[in-house]
């Protein structure tokens, strides 16, 4: 019971802190040197609009993961798990975590930042579907049972993402047709990128969660963040 409470608390803190990450990421990439890059000056001159957004999103995601990797390595050293980290990399669980990290890091994280840049914070609840997608993948791959409450939660998550994603663009008189009419091409691409991020993180959660059963969580997060940052 105590582990359950601790897990729920950590999950709530994770969601709260990730919301802060999103806010700071959005603000940071709208100021300073990023503005010059988006203006197509300097090293960004000659790049297409999509190439520019993709490149900067990848850089933004990489900065986040590199900083996180440094922190996890320091923490692992403090608690005496750095040796376990080095030994675990070339094991089967370690290789699984590396593959999962590539899916969830360079691919999903970059897609998430692309979504933020092209559609704004409206994509956050869409990307947050990763937990529901991970539960579905776990049911398919590992035959994990889904209780009635879990299924209801998954349905609510999908419904909430659709409602927030659509009505975030206003409630015009034309109904759904009017809502879609208010969306720009960039916004549509951003929403698609958010779904890709949710899918990537869902896969990472399901596959990486399996590997975490054989590797300590402190070691697993080190492997994940270092792989993603590199």
Regions inferred by a protein language model and the residue ranges of each:
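Hydrophobic, well-ordered secondary-structure segments
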Residues: 126-129, 133, 149-152, 189, ...
């Amino acid at each position: 019971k105590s582990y359950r409470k601790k897990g729920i608390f950590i999950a709530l803190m994770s969601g709260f802190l990730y919301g802060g990450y999103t806010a700071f990421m959005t603000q940071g990439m709208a100021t300073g040197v990023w503005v010059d890059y988006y203006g197509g000056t300097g090293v960004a001159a000659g790049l297409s609009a999509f190439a520019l957004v993709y490149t900067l999103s990848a850089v933004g995601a990489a900065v986040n993961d590199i900083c996180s990797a440094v922190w996890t390595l320091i923490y692992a050293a403090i608690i005496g798990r750095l040796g376990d980290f080095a030994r675990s990399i070339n094991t089967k669980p370690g290789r699984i975590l590396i593959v999962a990290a590539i899916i969830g890091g360079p691919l999903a994280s970059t897609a998430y930042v692309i979504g933020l840049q092209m559609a704004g914070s409206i994509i956050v609840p869409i990307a947050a579907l990763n937990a529901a997608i991970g539960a579905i993948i776990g049911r398919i791959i590992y035959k994990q049972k889904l209780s009635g409450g879990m299924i209801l939660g998954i349905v609510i998550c999908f419904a909430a993402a659709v409602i927030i994603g659509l009505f975030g663009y206003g409630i015009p008189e034309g109904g759904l047709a009017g809502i879609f009419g208010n969306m720009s091409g960039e916004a549509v691409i951003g929403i698609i990128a958010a779904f890709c991020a949710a899918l990537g993180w869902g896969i990472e959660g399901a596959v990486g969660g399996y590997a975490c059963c054989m590797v300590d969580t402190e070691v697993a997060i080190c492997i994940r963040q270092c792989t993603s940052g590199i």
